[in-house]
């Protein structure tokens, strides 16, 4: 796995290395040292001059540096062409207010300790005591600010504070002065100035009345005085900004409430996607293997495009068309093809989108969907997985007034109710037609039920051709052979098969998809991925070899069993080994003898363990489970028991909200149940005896098959048929003869070419080692 390159290391010139892995040192200049010039980038497309030597320098740059420069330029171009992002006005206002609040708080934190809030009386007292230096009066805010000297302590006189300050300073200076009159205010000193009452601080106070302030300050001319007039802009902002902010918040909250109301009201609107101009690129020609379904849908499309062609004959367009079939057969693909081919509006929606947690939403969405379709008529509505909303009504588990029933009732009315609706066609798809309501399936609503079943051999060939159209396919790939080997696969399985083959081809670094990749992908889909890391001991490998050989040999000897194509003991998925048996043709009916032979094949692995390993293991658990299920169906469902006669036992329950297949109701007596169990046991015993008889009579062949499997792990094709037909020795002799003939041809080839060129003539010694190696059989590819 490649790692993402570290751009920090690539941008650092000190990390660049040369081919030896060392940091390249530039040659030392002999003259005056100069700073290395940084190469400038010129855009040749803009007409910038191209300096000589640019191509040489560009070619000398390391490859990784060039790739990084290209990526950097591409990122810069995409960054410059990115559309600008618009910020809402409300977001900008909120960010501005938050920044203003944070800034004011930080200013208060910085200057808050140096500013004192004084009362009016404290301010007047400070002015009268001569502790105020200046006064700035704001006429608009009725505040005074400035600088002053605070008093020492509450209740102390100025003289005491002054003398204590002098004494503290003299103590620090090492001299103590004894004042002659401590209570006097004027203390003479030669070392200190007069204003040492404390640290100068800022103050602010509220003072109403400019005239009284003038009278106070006129008595103290030493105080500086200044008056500031209020600004009109400031007053307007102070008075209007709160109202604007409040109005903005109201608008924001109302817009949010409006959005919430709109979202609540939109619950009842349908979420269908309208396809008009940008139609899917799928056409009817892309749908292979379903010719009958395509023909039916083409007729509906033609009726909408050319209604007069049918109306003159008195024909009415089908109101609804129901696509029925197992998963993966192409029901949704057919609907997409209709959307791609039709020249009318196409509405597509899923059945689960009608169901919500609110009561009445489903019915409202059905009404809204058909209203949109009627406005765009003629039009087509496609509902995928309609069983999510169209299940049968009844008591069940949800009651008579279940929300799903209301939605279904509205759908029934819209399709064929009191109002006529001739211009809207409903196409629906489901794989559970058995749980749909009968009123939904009646003529007038879903007039047609188109069965979209699995493709046959011809259909699989066409599907493979469609999926191989845009892929490089090798000459050895035979699509018809692949179609025969993929019996029972749907269109989705075949698409996945070809896609897995393409992925495997890319993993192996090949240019074309070969048959080996297709076979490997087929086994991957059928049995799971190969478990290469699982290590098995020799005893386990031997048990698996005999187990799979038993399955293969019993299946080969029975007439009605499917042909064996491959045997392997390589673990895949949850299996330690498997035998691939694929029918030569599609089977639509299975006979009783074929089912009995299938039971014997299931028991072949367990019987082989009993005969050749001396003990049984858990490896046959899945075989026994499938065999028991088949035997019980023969007795209970298919009436293939001679002892119980031609009848079935057990009826499925009718819990429609559980899918109708939750369980079976036992409608027979305990004695009959005992007879059923005895009959199932008898069928299993007969299958065991059949497999035991076949394997015990062919023990030498079983030993040979197990030995070859232990050596090669996988046998298929001619090797598999040689083992099953007990002609392994003849097969080896044939391969040895072919290898010897090939070696002889290779030995003669150099002698013929050596005659015209004398100097190239060499003895035939180089090909001599091929002669003793020729008898060795070619080894099969290990998996």
UniProtKB/Swiss-Prot annotation:
GO terms for cellular component: plasma membrane. Residues 1-16, 738-771 have a biased composition (Low complexity). Residues 772-783 have a biased composition (Pro residues). Residues 1-86, 255-783 are cytoplasmic. Keywords: ATP-binding, Cell membrane, Hydrolase, Membrane, Metal-binding, Metalloprotease, Nucleotide-binding, Protease, Transmembrane, Transmembrane helix, Zinc. It is an enzyme of class 3 (hydrolase). Zn(2+) binds at residues 547, 551, 623. Residues 108-233 are extracellular. Residues 1-79, 738-783 are annotated as: Disordered. GO terms for molecular function: ATP binding; ATP hydrolysis activity; ATP-dependent peptidase activity; metalloendopeptidase activity; zinc ion binding. SUPFAM superfamilies: FtsH protease domain-like, P-loop containing nucleoside triphosphate hydrolases. Residues 35-61 have a biased composition (Basic and acidic residues). Its cofactor is Zn(2+). Its main location: membrane. The active site is at residue 548. It is a multi-pass membrane protein. The chain crosses the membrane at residues 87-107, 234-254. It is found in: Cell membrane. Acts as a processive, ATP-dependent zinc metallopeptidase for both cytoplasmic and membrane proteins. Plays a role in the quality control of integral membrane proteins. Homohexamer. This is ATP-dependent zinc metalloprotease FtsH. It comes from Slackia heliotrinireducens (strain ATCC 29202 / DSM 20476 / NCTC 11029 / RHS 1) (Peptococcus heliotrinreducens).
């Amino acid at each position: 796995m490649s790692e993402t390159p570290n751009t920090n290391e690539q941008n650092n010139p000190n990390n660049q290395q040369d081919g030896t892995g060392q940091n390249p040192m530039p040659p030392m200049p002999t003259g005056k040292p100069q700073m290395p010039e940084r190469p400038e980038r010129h855009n040749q497309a803009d007409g910038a001059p191209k300096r000589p030597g640019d191509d040489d320098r560009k070619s000398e740059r390391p490859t990784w540096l060039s790739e990084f420069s290209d990526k950097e330029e591409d990122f810069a171009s995409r960054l410059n062409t990115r559309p600008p992002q618009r910020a809402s006005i409300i977001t900008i206002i909120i960010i501005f207010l938050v920044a203003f609040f944070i800034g004011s708080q930080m200013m208060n934190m910085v200057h808050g300790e140096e500013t004192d809030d004084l009362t009016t009386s404290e301010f007047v007292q400070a002015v009268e005591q001569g502790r105020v230096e200046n006064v700035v009066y704001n006429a608009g805010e009725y505040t005074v600010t400035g600088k002053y000297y605070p008093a020492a302590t509450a209740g102390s006189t100025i003289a005491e504070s002054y003398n204590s300050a002098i004494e503290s300073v003299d103590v620090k200076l090492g001299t103590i002065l004894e004042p002659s009159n401590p209570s006097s205010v004027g203390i003479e000193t030669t070392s200190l100035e007069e204003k040492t009452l404390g640290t100068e601080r800022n103050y602010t106070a509220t003072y109403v009345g400019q005239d009284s302030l003038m009278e106070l300050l006129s008595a103290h001319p030493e105080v500086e005085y200044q008056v500031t007039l209020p600004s009109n802009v400031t007053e307007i902002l102070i008075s209007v900004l709160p109202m604007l902010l409040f109005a903005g918040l109201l608008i924001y909250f109302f817009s949010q409430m409006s959005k919430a109301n709109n979202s609540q009201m939109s619950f009842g609107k349908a979420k269908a996607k309208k396809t008009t101009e940008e139609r899917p690129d799928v056409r009817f020609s892309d749908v292979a293997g379903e010719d009958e379904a395509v023909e039916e849908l083409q007729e509906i499309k033609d009726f909408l495009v050319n209604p007069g062609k049918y109306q003159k004959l008195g024909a009415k367009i089908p109101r609804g068309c129901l696509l029925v079939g197992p998963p993966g057969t192409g029901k949704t693909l057919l609907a997409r093809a209709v959307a791609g081919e039709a020249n009318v509006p196409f509405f597509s929606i899923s059945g689960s989108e009608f169901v919500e947690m609110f009561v009445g939403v489903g019915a409202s969405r059905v009404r809204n969907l058909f209203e949109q379709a009627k406005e765009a008529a003629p039009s087509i509505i496609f509902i995928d997985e309609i069983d999510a909303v169209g299940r049968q009504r009844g008591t069940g588990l949800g009651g008579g007034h279940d929300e799903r029933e209301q939605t279904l009732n509205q759908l029934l009315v819209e399709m064929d109710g009191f109002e006529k609706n001739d211009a809207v066609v409903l196409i629906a798809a489901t794989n559970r037609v058995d749980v749909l309501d009968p009123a939904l399936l009646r003529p007038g609503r879903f007039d047609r039920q188109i069965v979209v079943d699995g493709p046959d051999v011809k259909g699989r060939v066409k599907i493979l051709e469609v999926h191989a159209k845009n892929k490089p396919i090798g000459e050895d790939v035979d699509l018809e052979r692949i179609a025969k080997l993929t019996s029972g696969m749907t269109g989705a399985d075949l698409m996945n098969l070809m896609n897995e083959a393409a992925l495997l081809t890319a993993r192996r670094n090949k240019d074309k998809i070969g048959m080996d990749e297709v076979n490997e992908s087929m086994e991957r889909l059928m049995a799971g991925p190969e478990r290469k890391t699982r290590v098995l001991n020799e005893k386990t490998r031997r048990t698996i070899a005999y187990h799979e050989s038993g399955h293969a040999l019993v299946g080969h000897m029975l007439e009605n069993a499917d042909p064996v194509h491959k045997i392997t003991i390589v673990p895949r998925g949850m299996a330690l080994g498997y035998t691939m048996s694929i029918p030569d043709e599609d089977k639509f009916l299975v006979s009783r003898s074929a089912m009995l032979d299938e039971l014997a094949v299931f028991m072949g692995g367990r019987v082989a363990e009993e005969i050749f390993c001396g003990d049984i293991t858990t490896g046959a658990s899945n075989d026994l489970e499938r065999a028991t299920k088949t035997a019980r169906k023969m007795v209970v469902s298919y009436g293939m028991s001679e002892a119980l006669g031609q009848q079935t036992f057990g009826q499925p329950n009718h819990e429609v909200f559980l899918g109708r297949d939750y369980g079976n109701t036992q409608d027979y007596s305990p004695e009959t149940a005992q007879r059923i169990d005895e009959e199932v046991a008898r069928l299993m015993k007969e299958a065991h005896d059949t497999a035991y008889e076949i394997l015990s009579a062919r023990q030498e062949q079983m030993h040979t098959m197990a030995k070859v499997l232990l050596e090669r792990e996988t046998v298929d094709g001619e090797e598999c048929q040689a083992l099953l037909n007990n002609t392994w020795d003849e097969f080896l002799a044939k391969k040895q003869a072919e290898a010897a003939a090939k070696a002889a041809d290779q030995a003669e080839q150099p002698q013929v070419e050596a005659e015209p060129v004398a100097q190239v003539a060499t003895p035939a010694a180089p090909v001599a080692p091929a002669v003793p190696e020729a008898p060795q059989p070619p080894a099969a590819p290990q998996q």
